[in-house]
Amino acid sequence: MIGSLKGSVESLGIDNCIIETAGGVGYRVFMPAAQLAQLTQGASVRLHIHTAVREDAIVLYGFLSQEYYDLFELLLTISGVGPKMALGILSAVKPDAFYLAVQSRDIKVLTKLPGIGKKTAERLLLELKDRVGPVAAESGDSFGEAVAAGGSGAVAEA
């Protein structure tokens, strides 16, 4: 399993980038929209990586911060949430705002996230209620402001 990746940003796509390592190998890495927007072509970067192994593909999901990586991993423990849905959530909202929504048990807020209907939101609240500790809102951001700042929410097929 690949746990981290260090190299230069070779190219940028809508929902992914190619990171070329010192050995000359380029890895396609899918990332949350807001974090992908922080990258520039040619820049050096180190990403926290989740490696998803499927029958038909090995897919890398990358994160600039441990906070995003940890929430991605937590979301994958929820029944019915796979890597694409977790990436969609992280493309739409910052981790602190997501945790705040779970703590306040506001199902209406969670259903605004891409791919999250009422049943999935209820499952998120049920399965995360005892696993999410207290979180202070980032500089007083409301959930709506944090969703807007998080990204477009668009996730292309991997």
Which stretches of residues belong to each language-model region?
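Structure-specific DNA junction-binding interface
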Residues: 1-77
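Amphipathic, charged-and-aliphatic alpha-helical interface segments
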Residues: 58-63, 83-102, 123-132
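Glycine- and Gly-Pro-enriched alpha-helical subdomains that act as flexible
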Residues: 111-114, 124
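Conserved Walker
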Residues: 120
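Strongly charged, low-complexity linkers/loops
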Residues: 127-158
